[in-house]
């Protein structure tokens, strides 16, 4: 993480005096000294603090030192506050690091809050710290915390539809820091807050403890959370196995946040928490019981920066502290301390740049809220309580033969979403258990009465079951007969004689209007050329009076096996708005072809490569959403997967709805190109690495390959630079495919400009083209992801407008085809003139005969100007000369304002009125747009020459004001789009009270411009305005180039 330039000095507690004139920063550390069982022990965290200080030293030209005040081994709630008080009294630190234990952290946090001193820790997981009241207002947790674990558990319950109850078991010896109690506390509070019935019990480490635990489980819940040492879990599971609680009706979540149970130990191998030094029968029972266990751990950051950090951490721990640390999730805490220190330095720098000081601890802590940045532990996201969002992993017995536990899901705390790896959870009964099965807990329910049935009831029940079985059997037989009849009827078959071919331009004319988005060149379906880069038109024809797309199949004949017949039936059955409709197939040799719905706008690749089409992000998100919907439906259908998804296989119909084509009918597909041809490799740019290797894949694997292809298409849509764009590299498709197939780290993927794209969109791309198929999301998850950051959603205005224009143009072509060209030309001129007089949206409403409703705008900026001395000039000139002068001047002005997001309202004589912020709202950009336009007009006037008086200087007087207005159309004859409100009057007063060749702005406009900090303004003073009284006004002098200066 790059830090802005700032002079820092970290003064040592044993270093003596701060250098005169230097701005020193003192860090104080309060952490356990020797006890390595704590993830936040000083020998574990100290190397990370040293590495953070060195990182600051590399980024900043300063002398950096640090010291610590260690505690003696244990988490002492008495020694920790005493140490903190000593540090404050004798060294006055600017930042406290630690403690990690809950009780000491609570004591020290109260002191730090009183001192207004930032307290940064990656421990202190208790839920109570999330409430940043007066006691903990300066506490910042950059590590995991129990409430975030609770959020993950609530998300799990929502996924599995567990909404009734849960049971919690934990070990609590009430000694030291009670880690199990505070960990499960977050789960308890989160589930209780979700209106679940949650019961908890402390596990008794005594004879009879396992029996008490299973009795508690039977009475209180099928979803069980256990937090304690692994030995405790083994004892409970062995008793549960004896009582048949591991039959699939219960699921046991083991909260092992540091994953110690999954690490190799003296009696177990890696990923096998069920192994223990027990008898053979007990070991087998444990292995079977662990099929019902899911382990929850923190997620180790997958980024290479963390791996490098961990290697350096282990080396520094050995060299500086003499301890041997191994790879462990406990090292994540050290990384969180590292990121926390760099985050503090970044925020402190911003605070000083804004005029604050390092003593302003509350301000520094407040600036950390809601911050996002990339650290060594990955993406660091702080919530509004200054607690870091935490990622978790859900582990399950992924391999029943070996018993190895593998990741089943990853949870992203920043996105509040679970990403399933694709490895199924081995539910004993094939599905997750119910958390509230009938008659399990509510025994008072009358339906739970187990009184034996009478003989008459048994006979009636048997008769009913017999009739039901007879009805079901009859239905199945009937369905089977209908299926065979449908297969034999071959409703899909099209004779070659039924397809009519003719002038393609005639089809093109009947396919829809070409007036929208300059799409004449993309009016046919598209195929890739032999070079694999550009598109050519697909074959089209007529079938039963409709234009259809015809795809020829390079096969001599098709054998109608039962499998082929089923493929063709499935193609007829699968119909969806975002899939091209399968019309039929022709199998008459040699004219074998597939006939599908015709989409006149061409392929998605055509549209993306057509530079004349301006695709805004709302339109792009609409195309992406259509593609995701189509693939989600396809994956859930009988066809199951596409297998060859690419942008050229996504076509757009006349209403700009994207549809997927070339799916299904595997028996018809063939590759015509040679194995080493350029076109073949160009088509493989969208192909997943596992398919490039040539190994056959199961259905789920093909679906994950489709997700990879979608990721490449997503990059095409975002950058519009072609498939697999590589910045600065000129590689052939064959070279690209070979690099992807090799799979060497770092994996070869397209280039992404993170500065220009939505961060969540970039993250989705990277997950879709992950090397491991299990890491890729499915289209159901992608649909939810797209829905979150495409908040516009729904049918767009553009889509509705295009649909109406298409329908209107088609009707005209059919009714008056001979006069269409002349009519359209006159219509185009009339519309162009109308759009110059009125805003486009208003003109469309008037064209439809609708009443234009007045619209209120909360904030716009209005520009008024006139010519000083125009009356005298007019008196000395002929009327024709005056008209020529105004025409020259306003033609110049009109050309200039086209470069800005403004709307010209009217010109009356020498008065010129312009507004920004309506009719299209542009957020807060209206004030700077008008300011830049005014400066440009003032600059143009200086060089403007009057034809009949070339030696006279034209003097323009400008007034600008910002405020609310109401806009609407006035009158029926020669309607005008007018603005109303006091803002218009005030803007006029600003102009009339201004001075020649100056820009007179109000205080509200000045405030709006000050938010950018790049405009030069000068106070004019209080000016008496007619009807307004005194108003404070300013002169706009110009705009500074470049960003505001840094401290």
From Swiss-Prot:
Gene3D superfamilies: 3.40.50.2300, Nucleotide cyclase, Transferase(Phosphotransferase) domain 1
Membrane topology classification: Single-pass type I membrane protein
Cytoplasmic side: 479-1047
Posttranslational mods: Phosphorylated. Phosphorylation of the protein kinase-like domain is required for full activation by CNP.
Sugar attachment sites: 24, 35, 161, 195, 244, 277, 349
Keyword Transmembrane helix in annotation: yes
Gene Ontology MF term list: ATP binding; GTP binding; guanylate cyclase activity; hormone binding; identical protein binding; natriuretic peptide receptor activity; peptide hormone binding; protein kinase activity
Effect recorded for residue 417 to E: In SNSK1; loss of C-type natriuretic peptide-induced signaling; dominant negative effect; no effect on cell surface expression
Pfam families to which the protein is assigned, alphabetical: ANF_receptor, Guanylate_cyc, PK_Tyr_Ser-Thr
Phosphothreonine: residues bearing it: 516, 529
EC number(s) stated in the UniProt entry for this protein: 4.6.1.2
Annotated S-S bridges: 75-101
Guanylate cyclase domain mapped to chain residues: 861-991
Name of protein: Atrial natriuretic peptide receptor 2
Lineage, uppermost ranks: Eukaryota, Metazoa, Chordata, Craniata, Vertebrata
Gene name of this polypeptide: NPR2
